[in-house]
Amino acid sequence: MPEDLAKQLASYKAQLQQVEAALSGNGENEDLLKLKKDLQEVIELTKDLLSTQPSETLASSDNFASTQPTHSWKVGDKCMAIWSEDGQCYEAEIEEIDEENGTAAITFAGYGNAEVTPLLNLKPVEEGRKAKEDSGNKPMSKKEMIAQQREYKKKKALKKAQRIKELEQEREDQKVKWQQFNNRAYSKNKKGQVKRSIFASPESVTGKVGVGTCGIADKPMTQYQDTSKYNVRHLMPQ
């Protein structure tokens, strides 16, 4: 993942340089100005994502999570989960499970708040309630605080990734306009040169349509010597 982001970042920077070079000769072009702004934004978002990539597995809390999943979860299950905003445990429902990344999208019951949280941080309702009662209002441990901070950063990174996706779509929409701009610039540099079709009407009455595509369309057709005397019968053995 970090390697992919690094490649994308390099690509965005190269595109930004091209746009800035184009703006140096056409600083009032709205399409180019919009493209420059989008590229600058996506570059900053990608940098932020690179800086928030986790270097190790999310640490579990002392009283709430274990190092290995102890429950087989499925969509629709009720569970107890930690809310990243206050680090407290609340009842929630699993909306979606990402087995590859070991995460689940949950919605807190009675609140409607949605979050993406590691499966390791989920507990069955009864077990979670007991852990919450046992802990009471005890301050969060250092591991819990680290887990909360990382979860917050992860949630923020997901939003940034979504924004990058939106900007990518906008850039795709701008690609046609960008190509049109390049075509117009090329046409201006070639001003005075007329590109003729091979099917264009010749200027002289002796010219032939579609003949002489190398700049000789107005010249008469090449005359060939009559070779009818070389009949096949002359080639047959006597």
Swiss-Prot record:
Keyword Nucleotidyltransferase tagged: no
Q: What is its main location?
A: nucleus
Q: According to the UniProt record, list the residues that bear N6-acetyllysine.
A: 219
Question: What is the designated name of this protein?
Answer: Survival of motor neuron-related-splicing factor 30
Residues with the modification Phosphoserine, per the entry, are 201
- Give the species: Bos taurus (Bovine)
Please indicate the residue ranges that the annotation assigns to the motif Nuclear localization signal.
142-160
By sequence similarity, the record places it as follows: Belongs to the SMN family.
- Give the GO biological process terms: apoptotic process; mRNA processing; RNA splicing
